[in-house]
Amino acid sequence: MKIVTGLRRCGKSFLLFHLYKNYLLENGVSEEQIVELPLDEIDNIRYRNPFELNTYIKSRVSDPTKRYYVFIDEIQFCAEVPNPYLDDSSAKVTFIDAVLGLMKLNNLDLYITVSNSQMLSREVLTQFRDRGDEIHVLPLSFAEFWDAFRTLSATASPSVTDAWREYCTFGGMPYILSLDSPEGKSRYLKNLFKETYLKDIVERKDVRNEREVLEILLDFVSSAIGSLTNPAKLEKRFLSEKKIKVSHNTIAKYLDYFSEAYILDAVKRYDVKGAKYFSTPLKYYFADVGLRNARLNFRQIEENHIMENIIYNDLVRRGFNVDVGVVSISTREWDVRGIQKKNNVRLEVDFVANKGSRRYYIQAALSVADPETHAREIRSLRRIEDSFGKIVIVKDDIVPRQDKDGILYLSITDFLLNEQALTI
C-alpha cells in the first residue's frame, strides 16, 4: 500500500487521479483495472462505512488473474462504526481495519490519500507503521515551476530571472500558476491559511479558543525563518510584543501541530566535529515560501532568507536529511594585561546534507563578491577537516568553479535546475 501524504492543496489527488492514472492507461492497464473512489463525493457516502468500503472494493477486484489499482481519496471520511460482533459499545471498526484487510489481496495495488481536515497525514502513517510506503508530495520545485512558467507565460521569451522573482514571492503551490494577477495569488495563499490549514488544526486538535495564539505564533516563525529560535524565546516574545502569556510547553505543542500538517519543518543543529545534536535552539523552514510570505502580508520578503528556505526544500526533495551545522573552534587572544585568553567560538554552516554515504556542507549567500563577505561565508567550511563536499550557493549568475580550498561555488539557478550540480 502507498500512502500519499503532504501539505493540503499541493497536488496529491492530481498525482493519482490524473498523472498516475494516465501513466497506467498509456502502459496497457485497462480502465476496469483502475478503481477510483473519492470518499468526499456525495455519490460515495455509503462507502464511508468501513464494512461497505471493504465489500465494494472486493467486488471490483474479483478476478484473481488481473492486477488492479485502487485509489481511495480522502480516506479520513470513512467513519468509525460499532463492531456488531462485540457487546462492548466502545469497540469500533475503522478504515484502518478495512485497509489492512484489503492489503492482504495479492492482486491489488492500493493507494490512499488523506487530507488534514479530520486526520493529519502523519497520524495515518503511524497507524500502519511499516505496512505502508509513504509517497510524500511537495509543492512545486523551482525546476518544475520554471517548466510550467515558460509554458504558460504570455511573454515570448520568459526569463529565469522573472520566474525566480515570481517563485520567491508566491512560491510553488500548483494553483498559483493558473492565477494571472498578484492580487489573486495573494488572496489565494492567504485563504489557504485562513480557510484550510488553520481551520484543520483548530478542528482536529480542538483548540478553537487558541486560534489567535496560533496565528501570532505563525507570524513570529514566518518573520524568523533561517534564524535560531526555541519555545522559550517565543514565550518571551509573546509577552513583550503582544502582552500575552503563553507557556513554552504550549508553544512547543503548537509548533508540532504545524509540523504534523507539513506546514513547517523543524531543523536541528548538528555539531560537525563532536558528531552530536543540540536539542535547542533550532531553525524552522516553510514547506512553501509563498505561504510564508502570505502570513506576513508580503511585507517582509528578505531574499537571503527566502533563498535559504528554497535551498532547504530542494535538498529535502532530493532525499537528503538536512541539519544546520555547527563548527566549534578555539581562538586565543591577548588582553590588555598581556594575559592570553582562550575563546570558544561556534561557527555556523547553513546546511549539512546527508544521503547514504554522501555528505555536503552548504552555505547560502546572495553574493560573495565582497572580500569580507566571502571570508565570513567560507570561514566555517575551511575549519571542517573531513573530505566531504563544501559548497557555496549564491544568487549571482556565476560559472561553477572551485577555489584553492576545494570549495565549490554555484549559482542558485544552477543548483535548482540541475540535480547533479552538487557533484560538479
Give the positions of each predicted feature:
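Domain-level recognition of nuclease-like catalytic cores that cleave nucleotide substrates
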Residues: 397-424
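Structural recognition of the conserved hydrophobic beta-strand(s) that form the central parallel beta-sheet
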Residues: 71, 109-115
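Hydrophobic anchor at the beta1->P-loop junction of P-loop NTPases
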Residues: 4
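Accessory nucleic acid-recognition modules appended to NTPase machines
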Residues: 178, 182-358
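Hydrophobic positions on the alpha1 helix immediately C-terminal to the Walker A/P-loop
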Residues: 15, 19
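Short glycine-rich substrate-engagement loop in P-loop NTPases that contacts/grips substrate
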Residues: 35-66
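Conserved Walker B catalytic segment
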Residues: 76-111
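Interdomain motor-coupling "hinge/lid" segment immediately C-terminal to the ATP-binding subdomain
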Residues: 115, 122-228
